[in-house]
Amino acid sequence: MVTNSQEGETLPATSSVTGLPQKRFYRQRAHSNPIADHSFDYPARPEDVDWRSLYPNIGSEQQVEFADIGCGYGGFLVTLGEMFPDKLAIGMEIRVKVSDYVIDRIAALRMKNAETSAYQNIACIRTNAMKYLPNYFQKSQLEKMFFLYPDPHFKRAKHKWRIINQALLSEYAYVLRSGGLVYTMTDVEDLHKWIVSHMTQHPLYERLTDEEANADPITPKLYQSSEEGAKVVRNKGDHFLAIFRRI
């Protein structure tokens, strides 16, 4: 329940029609400073992660294989869960209200689909992936990583805060298996050029050809499955896609 400060009345945070949480009660600024000293609980090592608390039906040999970094309001994460029911996907989001929304959204979807066990394969955690990614994933654990509409950090002095940079690319390569894929999408051409430049210069990545990218069944979903992507489509903005393979 959420209190309307103007009216003094208590409003439901969940729609009575869909049973899903309403985004207007979870609003937060578009981006968060990744360098700030946020307070996070994080595991000391991947072996300490309690995955069963996030995925109730997880098998003893199962591991998270997809990571949506900066998952926003979870639209694309939900799509991943629908497309790959046998894979475990995690959304990582730094903003507290936004991550709360995704967690509540997944809980509501699981409840609505209790008979089919749908959406048991997706989860969200609030964390700073720029700092704590290796604390969650073992070497070569991930098959796919997604960076969709990341903060462009337009000012030159803040380019070091961009989630794609040389130091972090080595961390991503560590948790990605050989042949694993990194999907990037932005509506900012300058950021797209930055991503392509940094990833093609890194010795552990190669860019997929247009033919390879277009043949990937995930590619069409990258454009508007996420809330940010859908907004770009509504505003008739540009999309800049680049997919890279871990060598």
Swiss-Prot record:
S-adenosyl-L-methionine binds at residues 70, 93-94, 128-129, 148, 226-228. It is found in: Nucleus. Keywords: Methyltransferase, Nucleus, RNA-binding, S-adenosyl-L-methionine, Transferase, tRNA processing, tRNA-binding. Signal peptide: none annotated. It is an enzyme of class 2 (transferase). GO terms for cellular component: nucleus; tRNA methyltransferase complex. Its EC number is 2.1.1.33. It catalyses: guanosine(46) in tRNA + S-adenosyl-L-methionine = N(7)-methylguanosine(46) in tRNA + S-adenosyl-L-homocysteine. The active site is at 151. It comes from the Eukaryota. It holds the Pfam family Methyltransf_4. The keyword Repressor does not apply. SUPFAM superfamilies: S-adenosyl-L-methionine-dependent methyltransferases (SSF53335). InterPro entries: SAM-dependent_MTases_sf, Trm8_euk, tRNA_(Gua-N-7)_MeTrfase_Trmb. GO terms for molecular function: tRNA (guanine(46)-N7)-methyltransferase activity; tRNA binding. The keyword Metal-binding does not apply. Pathway: tRNA modification; N(7)-methylguanine-tRNA biosynthesis. Catalyzes the formation of N(7)-methylguanine at position 46 (m7G46) in tRNA. Belongs to the class I-like SAM-binding methyltransferase superfamily. TrmB family. This is tRNA (guanine-N(7)-)-methyltransferase. It comes from Drosophila virilis.
